[in-house]
C-alpha cells in the first residue's frame, strides 16, 4: 500500500504489543518508526526472567486484522495447546481442572522470547523502522502549540544522547515501567498508581526428557501447578518438550522468601520439603541451585492510569497503560486486544490518507473510554486468580465447585459459561472483561448455592434448581448487558473482527 508522508506514527517500545501494532499499522498504510530501549533481543539469549505466556482467541483476534492466515498458523506452530490445570498436591496426588466446557477449548503456551522475535521480524518485513538501544529520557510536547512536532530525547549505552523530532502521534508501548507514562504524569496530563505484590518470581526450567514421547517431561496438555499456600510453582510446556517453570514466593520479610533462600543447603532443603515430586523432573539439584542463585527476581505489579492519552498527540497501550499480574494469563491477550481496538479507532477516525490531529483525538479518547474499565476488570480478576492458584486449587471443596461449574456450562451452554471461558474466549462477541467480571460474580454465586450440604459430586446437583437460578439471576443481567454467550468462540477461524461502529 502506498504511504502518505503525512501519516507518520512513532511507537516507543518494540515488545509484543508495540511490534504487533506497528505491523498492523504499517501493513494498513501508515508509516511506522519504533524506538526500543534495549538492544535487539534477536541478538541476545533469553535472560531467565520471562514467564511463558498464554495466547487465547481474545488476543489472537488482533492478528486477523491483517487478513493473513500465516500469522495464526505460525502461532500454532510455535506453541503447545493447553486444555486445563494439573494440580500437584502436597501428598503426591494430582487433580485436573479443564479450562473450557470440553477439550475443544484450549489455550496456547508460547515463549515470550520467541513471540517477540517473531513479531519484530514480521514488523520489519512490513517496512517498520526499528531503532534499538534508544532509552527514552524525555518527551517535549511544548512545540505542539505552533507545529505538529514532538521532541523525543533518548540516551544510549555509554551516555550518548539523541534528539528526535517526530511528526504525528506518539504511541507508548514501553512496558509496565513506561517512561512515557511517567512523563505524561509529570506534565499533569494523567495520573496513575503502581501496586506491587509482596511476591516475586523466578524462572526455573524443567528440562526435556528424551525417554518420553516428544521429550515432554510432564503432561504437555496442562498448566502444572504445585500449590503450597505461601508459595507455588507453575509450569507450561515448550514446543521442544521442556517446561518453563516459575516459582512465586515472597521477595523478603519471610523465612521462605527469595531473600532468605541463598545457600545450596537452604535451597535444597526448601525443594526437598515442599516440592519432592517436582524434583523428579526438575533435574539435578546443582542445576536447580544454579538457577535459583543466578536468575533475577521479577516484580509483580498492577498499574492503573486515570487516562491513556493526551489529546490526539500521544496514547499509551498495553502494559504501559495498564500492567497486570500474570495469574489469569491475559496480559498479552489484553495488550493484543488493545492493538485491535486502537488500530480500528485510528483507521476509522484518522485514516492514512487523512490523518488529522482532531481525528486522532477522537480515536484516542474513545480508546481510553472503552479500554480503561476493561483493563481495571482484568487486573482485579488476575489478582483474584493469584489467590485461587495459591490457596484454593488444592482444596477439595473448591475443586467440587469447579466441576459443578463445568457441568452447568455443558448443560446450559447458551445461558451459563464460566468466568474463565468468558474472559479467554469471549472476545469474539461483546463479552468484554468488564462484562465477564460482572457475570462471573453472579454465576459463581449460583454454583455456591447449588453445592449444599451433602453434595459430594457434580452429578448430585439439582439441575432443575440450577435452571431456575440461571433464569432468575443470570438471564436478566445478560439481557441488560446485551451479552450473547453463544459468541464465546475458541476457534480463531470463526472469529470476526468488528468495526468500531459496531463495538462502541
Name what the model sees in each region.
Residues 2-8, 56-203:
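Conserved N-terminal helical subregion
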Residues 21-30, 62-65, 126:
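A short, Lys/Arg-enriched amphipathic alpha-helix followed by its capping loop at the start of a domain
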Residues 14-23, 27, 296-384, 388, ...:
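Conserved mid-domain beta->alpha element of the FAD-binding
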Residues 3-5, 344-504:
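C-terminal helical "tail/cap" subdomain of flavin- and related membrane-associated enzymes
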Residues 34-35, 172, 317:
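Generic enzyme active-site microenvironment
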Residues 17, 21, 40, 177:
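Conserved Rossmann-like nucleotide-cofactor binding loop
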Residues 121, 149-300, 304-310:
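Conserved FAD-binding catalytic core of PHBH/FMO-like flavoproteins
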Residues 26-48:
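Glycine-rich FAD pyrophosphate-binding loop
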